[in-house]
Amino acid sequence: MALLLLILESCSAGTYALNCKLTVKYRTLQGLCSVNGKTFLDFGDENHEGNATMLCPALYQSLTDISEVMWSLQSGNDALNVTTRSQYYQGEFIDGFWDINTDEQHSIYVYPLNKTWRESHSDNSSAMEQWKNKNLEKDIRNVLMVDFSCCLNKSSPHFREMPTLPTTAAHVDQPRSMACKSSPFDGLIMILLIYIL
């Protein structure tokens, strides 16, 4: 009965809010990601329980690559502060955005689902044109839609809805449905739940 309650609790959770606060410096990525307010991944502290390099190596590599691209696009040597906010339902990306703080007063918002860019101040359009980059947009989209989703599905039971098989890093051009495979037992569990209830 306890197992059934655990499965029911996991299934009803369904929607997850994943937020990250990252700091990008020259060849350095630091910060934390949380799911529904609980710390999930730690970028930079190798001894932390949520070490991103160990929990989600493909995600960590993707974010490291993106941070290097962002660093090359900025003018100056100030650290970039990046905030990501995204929502997932049963492991699938619903919506989200990246807020790239280019200096103390200006931010650029990237909405990868509808491929739009927006700036916090309209007087800073030259900065946005400098940042608007199709490869960066594609990489951000891939991280939100594939890498974060895979990491949520294969990580701690506190955050996933259903058991999943181990996943491999998804190729950028690979369809989302192929990126993370569900366990063949997912359907059986749902049938069992319906039968019991």
From Swiss-Prot:
Removed propeptide positions: 178-197
Tissue: Expressed in skin, and weakly in large intestine.
Lipidation (GPI-anchor amidated serine): S177
Signal peptide (residue range): 1-17
Positions annotated with a glycan in the UniProt record: N51, N81, N114
MF GO annotations: natural killer cell lectin-like receptor binding
Record InterPro entries: MHC_I-like_Ag-recog_sf, MHC_I/II-like_Ag-recog
UniProt keyword Lipoprotein present: yes
Family designation: Belongs to the NKG2D ligand family.
Function: Ligand for the KLRK1 immunosurveillance receptor. Binding to KLRK1 stimulates cell lysis in vitro.
Name this protein carries in UniProt: Histocompatibility antigen 60c
Name of the coding gene: H60c
